[in-house]
Amino acid sequence: MLIASFVNGVAILLAAFGLFALHAVEIWLWAALYLLLNAFPNLEQALYFSTSTYVTIGYGDVVLPVGSRILGVIEGANGIILIGWSTAFFFSIVDRLKLLERDLEKG
């Protein structure tokens, strides 16, 4: 059963890192859109704004131009939805792995 626990731990870590990577890709895509629209002068500001908006921190020290502020609202809503979905998905994986481990212990 030690092997099953190890495999489950690895699967959980892979799921967590995979979801983190997908969120990072989403943040980079939003930053690329902001650069494409010339909303920010460089990648650093675009990524900073995108990250703080995606995770709904929004410090307010870097803002979008007036004509494209609705994109920030959309990204924030997108981040809330996808982080919530990812959390539910992650705990679904953990629950299924625990059930599988329990079934393996029963024989």
Per-region residue spans from a language model:
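Hydrophobic alpha-helical transmembrane segments of multi-pass membrane proteins
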Residues: 16-24, 74-81
